[in-house]
């Protein structure tokens, strides 16, 4: 896989969402305190490097009292297929895990309030299909799914 883009929001000097393109050869040039090292520190946090620790001092000072700190990475050239278990081989596209550009985009999000960071949440920014009445299927428990199906069962059997 190749890293194509780094996404930063409310991380140190990056208040609004910034998308930093990465190519095969990328150089960061700028004045002192312009945020060059922050990009590398954000990558260390994203990839769980032992030196990449995040704390409340990493929240952008202009972010306000509450919000979310976001570190994301966009990847290309990922494997053609992935093996879930011995009998299940699929692709990221078949699992609807790719963004609108056909790339794998993963974000780590830390909500904060009054200078306190909460536990991270990890999201795939994906172009997932939608249909009326089927919102939030991935977050529903089995009983809720059965209830949803009973409500629409007749519509689909009568076609």
Which residues does each PLM region occupy?
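Beta-strand elements of well-folded, non-transmembrane domains
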Residues: 26, 75-79, 110-114
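Electropositive, glycine-dotted interaction segments
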Residues: 70, 88-159
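Generic intrinsically disordered, low-complexity segments enriched for polar/acidic and small residues
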Residues: 8-11, 25, 37, 43-44, ...
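Beta-strand secondary-structure signal
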Residues: 5-7, 19, 70-74, 105-107
């Amino acid at each position: 896989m190749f890293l194509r883009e780094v996404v930063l929001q409310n991380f140190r000097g990056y208040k609004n969402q910034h998308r930093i393109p990465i190519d095969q050869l990328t150089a960061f040039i700028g004045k002192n305190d312009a945020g060059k090292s922050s990009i590398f520190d954000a990558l260390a946090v994203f990839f769980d490097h032992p030196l990449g620790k995040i704390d409340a001092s990493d929240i952008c000072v202009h972010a306000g009292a509450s919000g979310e700190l976001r570190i994301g990475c966009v990847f290309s050239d990922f494997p053609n297929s992935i093996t879930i278990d011995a009998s299940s081989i699929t692709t990221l596209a078949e699992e609807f895990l790719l963004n609108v550009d056909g790339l794998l985009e993963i974000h780590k999000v830390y909500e904060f309030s009054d200078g306190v960071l909460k536990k991270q949440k990890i999201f795939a920014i994906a172009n997932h299909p939608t249909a009326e009445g089927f919102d939030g299927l991935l977050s529903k428990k089995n009983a809720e799914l059965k209830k949803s199906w009973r409500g629409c069962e007749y519509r689909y059997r009568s076609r």
